[in-house]
Amino acid sequence: MKTAHEVRPGNVIMLDGNPWVVLKTETSRSGRNAAVVKLKLKNVLLDSTTETSFKGEDKLDVIVLDRLDCTYSYFADPMYVFMDEEFNQYDVEAENLGDAAAYITDGMEDVCQVTFYEEKAISVELPIIVTREVTYTEPSARGDTSGKVMKPATIAGGSTLSVADFVKTGDMIEIDTRTNEFKKRV
Protein backbone atom coordinates (compact mmCIF):
# COMPACT_ATOMS: atom_id res chain seq x y z
CA MET A 1 0.00 0.00 0.00
CA LYS A 2 1.21 3.48 -0.89
CA THR A 3 -0.28 6.87 -0.25
CA ALA A 4 -1.61 8.77 -3.25
CA HIS A 5 1.42 11.12 -2.91
CA GLU A 6 3.83 8.23 -3.43
CA VAL A 7 2.25 6.88 -6.62
CA ARG A 8 4.27 7.59 -9.79
CA PRO A 9 3.51 7.29 -13.49
CA GLY A 10 4.16 3.70 -14.52
CA ASN A 11 2.86 2.23 -11.24
CA VAL A 12 -0.07 -0.18 -11.46
CA ILE A 13 -2.85 0.14 -8.89
CA MET A 14 -5.89 -2.04 -8.22
CA LEU A 15 -9.25 -0.25 -8.19
CA ASP A 16 -12.56 -2.12 -8.12
CA GLY A 17 -10.77 -5.38 -8.88
CA ASN A 18 -9.12 -4.08 -12.07
CA PRO A 19 -5.47 -3.18 -12.68
CA TRP A 20 -4.91 0.44 -13.76
CA VAL A 21 -1.66 1.92 -15.06
CA VAL A 22 -0.92 5.42 -13.72
CA LEU A 23 -0.23 7.63 -16.74
CA LYS A 24 -0.01 11.02 -15.03
CA THR A 25 -0.08 12.46 -11.51
CA GLU A 26 -0.84 16.02 -10.49
CA THR A 27 -0.83 17.30 -6.92
CA SER A 28 -2.67 20.45 -5.89
CA ARG A 29 -2.61 22.03 -2.47
CA SER A 30 -4.86 24.68 -1.04
CA GLY A 31 -4.30 26.69 2.11
CA ARG A 32 -6.82 25.05 4.41
CA ASN A 33 -7.52 21.70 2.83
CA ALA A 34 -5.38 18.61 2.48
CA ALA A 35 -3.51 18.02 -0.76
CA VAL A 36 -5.46 16.43 -3.60
CA VAL A 37 -3.76 14.07 -6.06
CA LYS A 38 -5.32 13.75 -9.51
CA LEU A 39 -4.45 10.57 -11.39
CA LYS A 40 -4.90 9.80 -15.06
CA LEU A 41 -5.36 6.03 -15.27
CA LYS A 42 -5.62 3.42 -18.01
CA ASN A 43 -7.37 0.10 -17.45
CA VAL A 44 -4.96 -2.68 -18.43
CA LEU A 45 -7.72 -5.10 -19.38
CA LEU A 46 -10.25 -2.83 -21.12
CA ASP A 47 -7.98 -0.14 -22.66
CA SER A 48 -10.20 2.61 -21.22
CA THR A 49 -8.83 5.74 -19.54
CA THR A 50 -10.20 7.82 -16.70
CA GLU A 51 -9.19 10.60 -14.36
CA THR A 52 -9.83 10.39 -10.65
CA SER A 53 -8.85 12.27 -7.50
CA PHE A 54 -7.65 11.11 -4.10
CA LYS A 55 -6.68 12.85 -0.89
CA GLY A 56 -2.92 12.88 -0.54
CA GLU A 57 -2.94 10.45 2.38
CA ASP A 58 -5.41 7.95 0.86
CA LYS A 59 -3.95 4.44 0.68
CA LEU A 60 -3.83 2.82 -2.76
CA ASP A 61 -3.12 -0.82 -3.51
CA VAL A 62 -0.05 -0.71 -5.75
CA ILE A 63 0.53 -4.16 -7.17
CA VAL A 64 4.01 -5.44 -7.81
CA LEU A 65 4.34 -6.71 -11.33
CA ASP A 66 7.17 -8.27 -13.26
CA ARG A 67 9.68 -5.68 -14.45
CA LEU A 68 12.49 -6.07 -16.92
CA ASP A 69 15.36 -3.72 -17.78
CA CYS A 70 15.17 -2.83 -21.47
CA THR A 71 16.42 -0.24 -23.92
CA TYR A 72 14.36 1.58 -26.52
CA SER A 73 14.72 0.06 -29.98
CA TYR A 74 12.31 1.73 -32.42
CA PHE A 75 8.80 3.13 -32.96
CA ALA A 76 6.29 1.15 -35.04
CA ASP A 77 3.13 3.26 -34.97
CA PRO A 78 1.32 2.98 -32.50
CA MET A 79 3.83 0.83 -30.57
CA TYR A 80 7.17 1.61 -28.97
CA VAL A 81 9.44 -1.42 -29.16
CA PHE A 82 11.90 -2.16 -26.34
CA MET A 83 14.59 -4.85 -26.25
CA ASP A 84 16.10 -6.71 -23.31
CA GLU A 85 19.66 -8.05 -22.90
CA GLU A 86 18.70 -11.30 -24.64
CA PHE A 87 17.34 -9.38 -27.68
CA ASN A 88 13.69 -10.21 -26.94
CA GLN A 89 11.39 -7.44 -28.15
CA TYR A 90 8.41 -6.06 -26.25
CA ASP A 91 5.73 -3.77 -27.72
CA VAL A 92 4.24 -1.05 -25.53
CA GLU A 93 1.31 1.04 -26.78
CA ALA A 94 2.14 4.73 -27.22
CA GLU A 95 -0.77 5.85 -25.04
CA ASN A 96 0.49 3.67 -22.17
CA LEU A 97 3.66 5.75 -21.98
CA GLY A 98 1.84 8.98 -21.08
CA ASP A 99 4.31 11.86 -20.58
CA ALA A 100 7.30 9.50 -20.82
CA ALA A 101 6.95 9.41 -24.62
CA ALA A 102 8.42 12.93 -24.80
CA TYR A 103 11.76 11.63 -23.49
CA ILE A 104 12.06 8.63 -25.80
CA THR A 105 14.35 9.40 -28.73
CA ASP A 106 16.19 7.40 -31.37
CA GLY A 107 19.59 6.29 -30.15
CA MET A 108 18.81 6.80 -26.45
CA GLU A 109 20.88 4.57 -24.22
CA ASP A 110 18.89 5.01 -21.00
CA VAL A 111 17.78 1.74 -19.42
CA CYS A 112 14.02 1.72 -18.89
CA GLN A 113 11.92 -0.68 -16.86
CA VAL A 114 9.15 -2.38 -18.83
CA THR A 115 6.26 -3.56 -16.64
CA PHE A 116 4.32 -6.73 -17.47
CA TYR A 117 0.82 -7.86 -16.47
CA GLU A 118 -0.07 -11.45 -17.36
CA GLU A 119 2.95 -11.57 -19.72
CA LYS A 120 1.85 -8.44 -21.65
CA ALA A 121 4.06 -5.31 -21.64
CA ILE A 122 1.82 -2.56 -20.28
CA SER A 123 4.01 0.37 -19.26
CA VAL A 124 7.50 1.81 -19.22
CA GLU A 125 9.20 3.61 -16.37
CA LEU A 126 12.06 5.91 -17.33
CA PRO A 127 15.07 6.67 -15.16
CA ILE A 128 14.40 9.57 -12.78
CA ILE A 129 17.09 11.72 -14.42
CA VAL A 130 17.72 11.73 -18.19
CA THR A 131 20.17 13.75 -20.27
CA ARG A 132 18.83 15.36 -23.46
CA GLU A 133 20.00 17.90 -26.00
CA VAL A 134 18.35 21.32 -26.23
CA THR A 135 17.19 21.59 -29.85
CA TYR A 136 15.89 25.16 -29.59
CA THR A 137 15.85 28.01 -27.12
CA GLU A 138 15.90 31.79 -27.42
CA PRO A 139 19.17 33.63 -26.79
CA SER A 140 19.69 34.97 -23.27
CA ALA A 141 18.11 38.34 -22.47
CA ARG A 142 20.82 40.84 -21.63
CA GLY A 143 20.56 42.61 -18.30
CA ASP A 144 17.84 40.38 -16.88
CA THR A 145 19.89 38.79 -14.09
CA SER A 146 17.85 39.38 -10.94
CA GLY A 147 16.78 36.15 -9.27
CA LYS A 148 16.35 32.80 -10.97
CA VAL A 149 15.73 33.62 -14.63
CA MET A 150 14.12 30.85 -16.69
CA LYS A 151 13.19 30.60 -20.37
CA PRO A 152 11.40 28.00 -22.51
CA ALA A 153 13.42 25.38 -24.39
CA THR A 154 12.61 22.46 -26.69
CA ILE A 155 14.55 19.23 -26.18
CA ALA A 156 15.20 16.24 -28.43
CA GLY A 157 11.90 14.36 -28.52
CA GLY A 158 9.85 17.56 -28.79
CA SER A 159 9.08 18.25 -25.13
CA THR A 160 9.16 21.86 -23.91
CA LEU A 161 10.31 22.90 -20.45
CA SER A 162 11.76 25.89 -18.61
CA VAL A 163 15.55 26.06 -18.40
CA ALA A 164 18.03 28.46 -16.83
CA ASP A 165 18.82 31.60 -18.83
CA PHE A 166 22.42 30.51 -19.54
CA VAL A 167 21.38 27.36 -21.47
CA LYS A 168 21.91 27.56 -25.25
CA THR A 169 20.74 25.53 -28.24
CA GLY A 170 22.91 22.41 -28.52
CA ASP A 171 23.63 22.15 -24.77
CA MET A 172 23.06 18.84 -22.99
CA ILE A 173 20.87 19.15 -19.88
CA GLU A 174 19.64 16.86 -17.11
CA ILE A 175 15.86 16.62 -16.63
CA ASP A 176 13.79 15.10 -13.82
CA THR A 177 11.28 12.89 -15.67
CA ARG A 178 8.84 12.89 -12.74
CA THR A 179 8.34 16.66 -12.78
CA ASN A 180 9.64 17.69 -16.24
CA GLU A 181 12.02 20.12 -14.53
CA PHE A 182 15.47 21.26 -15.62
CA LYS A 183 18.15 20.14 -13.14
CA LYS A 184 21.49 21.27 -14.58
CA ARG A 185 23.57 21.71 -17.71
CA VAL A 186 25.94 18.82 -18.36
UniProtKB/Swiss-Prot annotation:
Listed pathway(s): Protein biosynthesis; polypeptide chain elongation
Any one Gene Ontology molecular-function term assigned to this protein's record: translation elongation factor activity
One Pfam family, short name: Elong-fact-P_C
Subcellular location: Cytoplasm
Chain's role: Involved in peptide bond synthesis. Stimulates efficient translation and peptide-bond synthesis on native or reconstituted 70S ribosomes in vitro. Probably functions indirectly by altering the affinity of the ribosome for aminoacyl-tRNA, thus increasing their reactivity as acceptors for peptidyl transferase.
NCBIfam families cross-referenced by the UniProt entry: efp, PRK00529.1
Protein name as it appears in the record: Elongation factor P
Organism of provenance: Shewanella piezotolerans (strain WP3 / JCM 13877)
Lineage: Bacteria, Pseudomonadati, Pseudomonadota, Gammaproteobacteria, Alteromonadales
